[in-house]
Amino acid sequence: MRKHLNDLYKQIEKFPKTSGCYKMYSKDNKILYIGKAKNLRSRVKNYFSKRTSHKTKILMNNVTNIEIITTNSEYEALLLECNLIKKYKPTYNIKLKDDKGYPMIRITCEKYPRIFKTRKIINDGSEYFGPYVNVKNLDLVLDLINKTFKTKKCKKKSKNPCLYFHMGQCLGVCYREDLEDEYRKEIEQIKHILNGNISKLLNDIEIKMKEVIMKENFEAAIKLKETKKSLIEISQTQIITKIDKLSEDYLYIHKTNSLNTIVILKYKDGKLTEKDIHFDESIYEEDELIEKFITQYYTSPNMIVPDKIHIFKKIDTSNITKLINELKNIKTEIIYKETKDNIKIIEMATSNAKLALITYNHEKNKAIENLKTILEMKKLPKTIEGFDIAHINGYKTVASLVTFKMGKPFKDGYRVYKINSLSNGEIDDCKAIKEVISRRYSKLINEQLKLPDLILIDGGKGQLNSAYSILKGLRIEEKIAICALAKKEEIIFLPNKNQGIKLQKRNSALQVLQNVRDEAHRRANNFNNKLHNNIKLNYTKIKGIGEQKAKKILKVLGTYKDILLLNEDEIATKMKINITMANKIKKFAEEQNLNNKQNNHI
C-alpha cells in the first residue's frame, strides 16, 4: 500500500461508526467522489480492500484527503449525498448526477387540499413532507392515507359525486360546498400522521391484520404488514430537508481547553448543502465567542449572509444583527429556538464538530511526523520555537520568539527581545539573530530548562548560519534541530547543506513551518509598531504639538537620533515651522536620547 494510502487509512481509523457522507479530494483539492454510508468507518475502509475494482484503485491512487459529514440516519445520508453530488458533480459519480430528486408528499393550498406524490416544489403555500428515498414505501403509505381518509382526488368540480365518493374514499367536496370544517379535520389528521404520530394508525392496522388472518386472506395480511413497515420507516423525521424557500445557517461551537471547533451547517431551499468548519484558539467565553465569530464571519466581504442564522444558545444578538444588516444592506435574523427540528440539527452539528476536532488533531500529528522526516530529525518536533527580526530603518530593532506545541501556538512561550548589540541606524539581521539566540538558550541552559525540539529562523542561509554558530558555541547543536524558511521562495535551509528544500504548497510540513514563521513575523512587527507609536506619542509632550503634528514629525524627521543630525534651521525648513518650535523639537530629542542611553533602552 502506497504511503499516502497508509496515511489515509490511519485517518479513517478515527471515523465514527455512524451514518453520513464522505467526500474524497485530490491533491489539488478537487472533489473526486462523494458517497454515503450507514457506517462511515466500515464503508470507507472497503476502498482499501484488495478485491476492489480497477476503477476504484485508480480513484484511491488520486485521493489525498477524505472529509466526512455525519448524519442522524441513513436516510439523511442518502439525501445529503444526492444534494452534494448535484452541487459538485464529482468525476467518479455518475448514477446520481441526474436532477430527478426524491419524491415528496404535497398537500396543496386549495380550499379543499389534495394530497399526492411529487418531485417538484412549488412555492405557492403548499405543504411538503419528505423527501422519501424509498418510493415503494411512499406509495404504500399514500394508498393507506387515500383509503383511510376521505380526501379530494379529482381537480374539477362536478354536479354529481365522483367514483371515490361511492367507494367511501371522498366526502364529496367535488360537488358540495358545505364540507370545509369536516374536510379540514381530515387534513389535520393526515398531517399529524406525516409528522410521525402513527401509533393510532398502527393499532388500526394491527386490528385489520387480525381480521383478514381470521378470514385466511393471507395476501391482504401481507400487504397490511408491508404497509405497517412502510409507515414506520417514512415516519422517521427527515431533518436533512426543511421545505421552505429560505437560506439558513446553523451554528454550533464545541469548546475544549485548547481549541474551539466551530461548525456551520448551511441549508439552501430547505436542503443541507454544505458544512463549514473553523478552529479557534481564542480565550473568549462561549457567549462572547458566538458574538465575535458571527460578526467577523458574516461581515467578511465575500460572505453571502443567509435569511436566518440559528444559534445553539440564547444570547442577546440585537447589536450584531443590526451591524450585519447595515453593513450588508440585507435583512437577516439571528435566532435561538428549541424546536424539535432545530435541536436535531444542532445535535448533528455537535457530532460533526467533535469529529472535526479529532480529524484536526490527527492531521496536526501527521504534519509533525512529516516534518520530522523531511528535516531528518531524530525525534518529533513537538515543540518549535520561531524567531524573527524587525526594525524601523535600523532603529528600535527587536526580535520575537513564538512557541508552537504539536503544531499549535503556545502563547505562554511567546517573548519579545530588544536588541542591544546594534547601534541606532545599524541594519544587521544576522547580528541581531546571534544576540537573541545567545540570550534565549544561554538562559535555558543556565536555568536547566527544557530545550525545544526545533528552532525556525525567519530568513535565509545567512541568518541560519548565524544562529547555528551560537548553538555550536553553546555546544547544543546536537540537541536541537534548526532550520530557516525564506519568505518569497518558501525554501527550507538546513545547516551544513548547500541545497535548500522546496516543498509543494499544500505539503503539511511546510504549512506548519509557515504558521510558525508568520506568527513570529506578526509578533515582531506588532511590537515594533508599538514602539513606533510610542515615539509618536512622546512628541505630543512638546508644548504646541498635537497628535497630527507628532505624526508628521515622525514621518518627516524620523527618530530622536535622526533629529540630532539636523540643526534648528533644517528642522524648521523640513517641517515648515518657526525657529522657536524647531528649537523645542531639537531640545526634546536631545533629552529623550540621553534618557535612553542612561536607561539602556533603545
From Swiss-Prot:
Q: Which Gene3D superfamilies match?
A: 5' to 3' exonuclease, C-terminal subdomain, GIY-YIG endonuclease, UvrC, RNAse H endonuclease domain
In what residue span(s) does the UVR domain sit? 199-234
Primary subcellular site in the record, as a coarse category: cytoplasm
UniProt entry keywords in alphabetical sequence:
Cytoplasm, DNA damage, DNA excision, DNA repair, Excision nuclease, SOS response
> Which GO biological-process labels does this protein carry?
nucleotide-excision repair; SOS response
What Pfam family is a match for this entry? GIY-YIG
Task: Show where the GIY-YIG domain sits.
Answer: 17-94
Entry keyword annotation includes DNA repair: yes
Q: Where in the cell is it found?
A: Cytoplasm
Q: Which GO terms describe its molecular function?
A: DNA binding; excinuclease ABC activity
The answer to whether the entry has keyword Cytoplasm is yes
The Swiss-Prot or TrEMBL record describes its family as follows: Belongs to the UvrC family.
Its biological purpose is as follows: The UvrABC repair system catalyzes the recognition and processing of DNA lesions. UvrC both incises the 5' and 3' sides of the lesion. The N-terminal half is responsible for the 3' incision and the C-terminal half is responsible for the 5' incision.
This protein's assembly is summarised as:
Interacts with UvrB in an incision complex.
Protein name, as recorded? UvrABC system protein C
Q: Which organism is it from?
A: Borrelia recurrentis (strain A1)
